[in-house]
């Protein structure tokens, strides 16, 4: 499961790579945590849009945003079963552009259990280096605040699955 990722590509690079439109430049980050505003690319009637969304899906039916950080990932194996995601699969698909993501491993050499982050990036043709962005599948939703008329929040969850083999 992805809990942090790397975003060092600019809006211009994202727009160009995905042949999309967008006008909200976000701050670059080497450590994007849950609930941060991230880029999500979705399709409207005629074009691809790069939109800022909060990372942590809040279902449209939620009373508040308190559990957003619990829904940063959507497991592909259970997408059609979970109430938060099943209604989004058909019409609320997106991609999240990334430059890498972090996985943590427990280090036991010292006898303690600190977590060590490892940056994961794709390799191209067996090469160990990769300099560029890639995309993760995602689902998005718009949540309307029941307490404040006209206040809406666009949120997104990354679709994840089990890794194949060792990372």
PLM segments and residue spans:
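Short linear sequence motif anchored by a di-proline
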Residues: 1-167
């Amino acid at each position: 499961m992805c809990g942090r990722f790397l975003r060092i590509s600019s809006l211009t690079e994202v727009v160009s790579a995905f042949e999309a439109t967008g006008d909200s430049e976000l701050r670059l980050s080497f450590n994007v945590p849950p609930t941060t505003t991230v880029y999500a690319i979705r399709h409207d009637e005629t074009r691809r849009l790069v939109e800022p969304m909060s990372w942590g899906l809040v279902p449209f039916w939620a009373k508040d945003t308190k559990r957003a950080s619990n829904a940063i990932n959507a497991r592909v194996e259970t997408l059609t079963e979970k109430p938060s995601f099943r209604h989004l699969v058909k019409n609320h698909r997106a991609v999240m552009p990334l430059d890498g993501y972090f996985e943590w491993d427990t280090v036991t050499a010292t006898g303690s259990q600190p977590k060590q982050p490892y940056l994961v990036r794709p390799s191209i043709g067996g090469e160990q280096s990769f300099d560029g962005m890639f995309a993760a599948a995602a689902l998005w939703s718009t949540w309307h605040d029941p307490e404040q008329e006209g206040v809406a929040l666009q949120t997104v969850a990354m679709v994840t699955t089990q890794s194949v083999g060792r990372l």
